[in-house]
Amino acid sequence: FKNPECGEPHSLDGSPNGISCRGYFPSWSYNPDAQQCVSFVYGGCGGNNNRFGSQNECEERCI
């Protein structure tokens, strides 16, 4: 991977126990299986470093 965060699991909303949070932050994450950046809505808690503010930022870091 170009950067370590790109190898982390595709970022999802919520905590590991499946509770989603109430924030609404349009975000991008690198999906290693699809080998592309994908959009998702981050709820504001949980997740990991595989979360970016734009498609361009995700692609610059991971592709």
From Swiss-Prot:
Coiled coil: none annotated. It holds the Pfam family Kunitz_BPTI. Keywords: Disulfide bond, Protease inhibitor, Serine protease inhibitor. The record marks R22, G23 as: Reactive bond for trypsin. Disulfide bonds join C6-C62, C21-C45, C37-C58. Serine protease inhibitor. This peptide can inhibit, in-vivo, acrosin and, to a lower level, plasma kallikrein. It probably plays a role in Drosophila reproduction. This is Male accessory gland serine protease inhibitor. The lineage of its organism: Eukaryota, Metazoa, Ecdysozoa, Arthropoda, Hexapoda. The gene is PapD.
